[in-house]
């Protein structure tokens, strides 16, 4: 009887493989970084072959590290950096161009063109997304329009498109299976999230042939089996979800109104809205959380661009701390920020402002301002931005949040988590396993093969490490937040000509 599930977590900077047991405990983990390619300013690429090779290397390596055999693995679940786009030749299996990464801005002119035509409203309505270079649709168009011979090959049905999940599954099955799941499809800007199919009108507008696109399947489903030549046995590939949706699942946010916030370079907050796609009036994205058991569940998503990256800025550019954990130590040396606010709008502001021209500011400085105050204000900015998104989410959904589940690197910072609870006025729950993205992929795969029987069983695996209760008086909380809103106003539209 197979005792484990393997998650392949293909991220923006590294490929990871993690083995989990039945209780959701991590048995072994291995990761490998790969190259970031910057051909021009604002352009970001990855080599798809390097992604595949690094991913398969850690997959084989982690089995060895765990001291188990491939036949001990019940299923493989995949989670991936979303939106990143690969186009490859169906016959040779080779990419015709590098993968265009989600951060890449090269297709901004295509997006401006769609907006000028007024086509953005249609896209918002059908896909739940805002028109932005972030999503896959314009990236596919760019490859077809700019790589020699690509358009002709596509018309002849010789090319395949996929996000990283699709590319990995295709390679794991040696070209037998070309699929994606609902959550990844919903990030392409080509998928109608209400009708649950590729949208012909958008495909026509972007001139992308439908024959390139993968088949869309549930997020928990046996898509196929790994080719015997890879692990020596055939292992079912049975789970697939984009990284943020996988984290929502790994946090057991199964009921409408449950939300998680992942603290990484930026922050991604997702709230489960159940079987209803809630349109956003406040600048959030409406997205598919997952498709399981013949039905699809939706989520609202708010993306904050700079959170953990602001701590790196204190370390690398300002050089006022030596390492990230030190930020907590310094923040605790002072009682408050002495009236200082930091707005880390280094690349503009994401949800709910969507201001590309905002820039970073430090306000409220007086002669008494010390480095501890600036460090503390930078940490606090992460919590304020999270409140901005949460308020938008509550307004859109009409649901009042009971508690916020957290994960990701900065969720280990106790000062930040306590301040987060204080400024939101709701408890913040940190789980024992903060690797919730990989865990979510493992759960989706395990459910499809009966390794876990139900979501109830998974919920029992979710264990709290610590609950942070709000301890700040309402009056103080609102006064601090008013100051933040004032600081954000100073940052807005700064870089506009």
Curated annotation (Swiss-Prot):
Q: Which gene name does the record give?
A: glpK
Query: What EC number(s) does this enzyme carry?
Result: 2.7.1.30
Summary of activators and inhibitors of this protein: Activated by phosphorylation and inhibited by fructose 1,6-bisphosphate (FBP).
Q: Which InterPro entries match?
A: ATPase_NBD, Carb_kinase_FGGY, Carb_kinase_FGGY_CS, FGGY_C, FGGY_N, Glycerol_kin
Cellular component (GO) terms are:
cytosol
What is this protein called in UniProt?
Answer: Glycerol kinase
Residues that hold ADP according to the record: 12, 16, 265, 308, 409, 413
Pathway listed for it?
Answer: Polyol metabolism; glycerol degradation via glycerol kinase pathway; sn-glycerol 3-phosphate from glycerol: step 1/1
């Amino acid at each position: 009887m197979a005792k484990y599930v393997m998650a392949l977590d293909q991220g923006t900077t590294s490929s990871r493989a993690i083995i989990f047991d039945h209780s959701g405990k991590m048995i072994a983990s291995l990761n490998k970084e790969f190259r970031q390619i910057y051909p021009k300013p604002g352009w970001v690429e990855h080599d798809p072959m390097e992604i595949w090779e690094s991913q398969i290397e850690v997959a084989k390596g982690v089995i060895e590290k765990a001291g188990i055999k491939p036949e001990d693995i019940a299923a493989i679940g995949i989670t991936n950096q979303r939106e990143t786009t690969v186009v490859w030749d169906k016959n040779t299996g080779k990419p015709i161009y590098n993968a265009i990464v989600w951060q890449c801005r090269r297709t901004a002119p295509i997006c401006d063109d769609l907006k000028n035509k007024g086509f953005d409203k249609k896209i918002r309505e059908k896909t739940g997304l805002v028109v932005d270079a972030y999503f896959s649709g314009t990236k596919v168009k760019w490859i077809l329009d700019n790589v020699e011979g690509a358009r002709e090959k596509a018309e002849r049905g010789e090319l395949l498109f996929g996000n990283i999940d699709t590319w990995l599954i295709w390679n794991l099955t040696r070209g037998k299976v070309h699929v994606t799941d609902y959550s990844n499809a919903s990030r392409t800007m080509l998928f109608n999230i209400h009708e649950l199919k590729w949208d012909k009108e958008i495909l026509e507008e972007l001139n992308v042939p439908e024959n390139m696109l993968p088949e869309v399947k549930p997020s928990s489903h046996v898509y196929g089996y790994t080719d015997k030549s890879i692990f020596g046995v055939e292992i079912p590939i049975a789970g697939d979800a984009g990284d943020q949706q996988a984290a929502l699942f790994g946090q057991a946010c199964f009921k409408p109104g449950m939300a998680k916030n992942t603290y990484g370079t930026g922050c991604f907050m997702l709230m489960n809205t159940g079987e209803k796609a809630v349109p956003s009036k406040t600048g959030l994205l409406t997205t598919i959380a997952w498709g399981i058991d013949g039905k699809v569940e939706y989520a609202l998503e708010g993306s904050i661009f700079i959170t953990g990256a602001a701590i790196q800025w204190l370390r690398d550019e300002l050089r006022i701390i030596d390492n990230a954990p030190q930020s907590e130590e310094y923040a605790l040396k002072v009682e408050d920020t002495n009236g200082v606010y930091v707005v880390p709008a280094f690349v503009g502001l994401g949800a709910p402002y969507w201001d590309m021209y905002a820039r970073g500011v430090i306000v409220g400085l007086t002669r008494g301002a010390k480095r501890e105050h600036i460090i503390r204000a930078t940490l606090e900015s992460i919590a304020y931005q999270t409140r901005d998104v949460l308020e938008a989410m509550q307004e859109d959904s009409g649901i009042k949040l009971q508690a916020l589940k957290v994960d990701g690197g900065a969720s280990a910072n106790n000062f930040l988590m306590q301040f987060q609870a204080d400024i939101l006025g709701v408890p913040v729950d940190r789980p024992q396993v903060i690797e919730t993205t990989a865990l979510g992929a493992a759960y989706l795969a395990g459910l499809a093969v009966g390794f876990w029987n139900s979501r109830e069983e998974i919920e029992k695996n979710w264990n709290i490490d610590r609950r942070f209760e709000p301890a700040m008086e309402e009056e103080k909380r609102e006064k601090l937040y008013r100051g933040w809103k004032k600081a954000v106003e100073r940052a807005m539209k700064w870089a506009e000509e």
